[in-house]
Amino acid sequence: MSFRPGSRGGARGGRGGSRGGFGGRGGSRGGFGGRGGSRGGSRGGFGGRGGSRGGPRGGSRGGPRGGARGGARGGAKGGAKVVIEPHKHDGVYIARGKEDLLVTKNMAPGESVYGEKRVSVEEPSKEDGVPPTKVEYRVWNPFRSKLAAGIMGGLDELFIAPGKKVLYLGAASGTSVSHVSDVVGPEGVVYAVEFSHRPGRELISMAKKRPNVIPIIEDARHPQKYRMLVGMVDAVFADVAQPDQARIIALNSHMFLKDQGGVVISIKANCIDSTVDAETVFAREVQKLREEKIKPLEQLTLEPYERDHCIVIGRYMRSGLKK
């Protein structure tokens, strides 16, 4: 009888090995028997988070969501055949290859911010006799960025373009901020406000390589605390996910946003009121924005990238809305 548990363990280990193969280490540990097998199978096989933990390339191979949510370098099939085309929004591009990808021109070539894929393309020189230059683009993942999800969903107006000054509320560790930095380019500025200190540290280290990003570790509810750092801006982007989100946006818009400036807001219904359906929450928030002199231009759901999220584009009318 002493041999039977071992045989069960071996069988389980075999399962772990075969299923854990996606996760690198998960598979190799699976062969050791009982516990190793079960851990190898359950962790390595599922791809989303387990795959990325299991090995260096687990996330990118783990599955459709696993790859999108940020495996080490998953997502793009590039190569010499990639063609870069401009998107309808200035500063945003589409990389056409085996699959079409949303990309931005990398402000810091050679640097990856959150493990995203980079695509290098040779662009011919405008002058005769000058060799072509290599330009690097970064893949903008709509599963990791609400703004990218909105662009993929077909936003008509963005207000974020080369040379613009943008106030970004709720910058987190700088995933989307880095792409906004790419879009506005060296002539533009991104003021990135984040209250939490841990992602704030990552935001600061990202900003060290991008001269057009100004990180501000401060509460967006108190814009007077960073008024000496921020000038008048062309657009405010907000992804703060707080119940008083509309008030936070209004305070910052009144203080920093120029007349007729753009407001781009990502609304997460559950963070504002989880007792009613998402459409009701969105309608209430849009009405609050109207009361704060922000004229809504369009509203777009972020399906299939985010559930119960929408993005609202508005224009700030400093003189007030016409009735």
Curated annotation (Swiss-Prot):
EC numbers, comma separated: 2.1.1.-
What does the entry's PTM section describe?
By homology to other fibrillarins, some or all of the N-terminal domain arginines are modified to asymmetric dimethylarginine (DMA).
Keywords in alphabetical order: Methylation, Methyltransferase, Nucleus, Ribonucleoprotein, RNA-binding, rRNA processing, S-adenosyl-L-methionine, Transferase
Q: What class of enzyme is it?
A: transferase
- Residues of the region (Disordered) are 1-80
**Reaction(s) the record says it catalyses:** L-glutaminyl-[histone H2A] + S-adenosyl-L-methionine = N(5)-methyl-L-glutaminyl-[histone H2A] + S-adenosyl-L-homocysteine + H(+)
Give an example GO cellular component term for this record: box C/D methylation guide snoRNP complex
Biological-process GO terms, alphabetical: box C/D sno(s)RNA 3'-end processing; regulation of transcription by RNA polymerase I; snoRNA guided rRNA 2'-O-methylation
UniProt entry tagged with the keyword Magnesium:
no
Residue stretches spanning the membrane: none
> Where does it live in the cell?
Nucleus, Nucleolus
Q: Point to the regions of Gly residues compositional bias.
A: 7-78
GO MF term set: histone H2AQ104 methyltransferase activity; RNA binding; rRNA methyltransferase activity
Modified positions (Asymmetric dimethylarginine) are: 8, 12, 15, 19, 25, 29, 35, 39, 43, 49, 53, 57, 61, 65, 69, 73
Residues annotated as signal peptide? none
Family affiliation? Belongs to the methyltransferase superfamily. Fibrillarin family.
What is this protein for, i.e. what is its function? S-adenosyl-L-methionine-dependent methyltransferase that has the ability to methylate both RNAs and proteins. Involved in pre-rRNA processing. Utilizes the methyl donor S-adenosyl-L-methionine to catalyze the site-specific 2'-hydroxyl methylation of ribose moieties in pre-ribosomal RNA. Site specificity is provided by a guide RNA that base pairs with the substrate. Methylation occurs at a characteristic distance from the sequence involved in base pairing with the guide RNA.
NCBIfam families named in the record = PRK04266.1-2
Q: What is this protein called?
A: rRNA 2'-O-methyltransferase fibrillarin
State the organism of origin.
Answer: Candida glabrata (strain ATCC 2001 / BCRC 20586 / JCM 3761 / NBRC 0622 / NRRL Y-65 / CBS 138)
Q: What gene is behind this protein?
A: NOP1
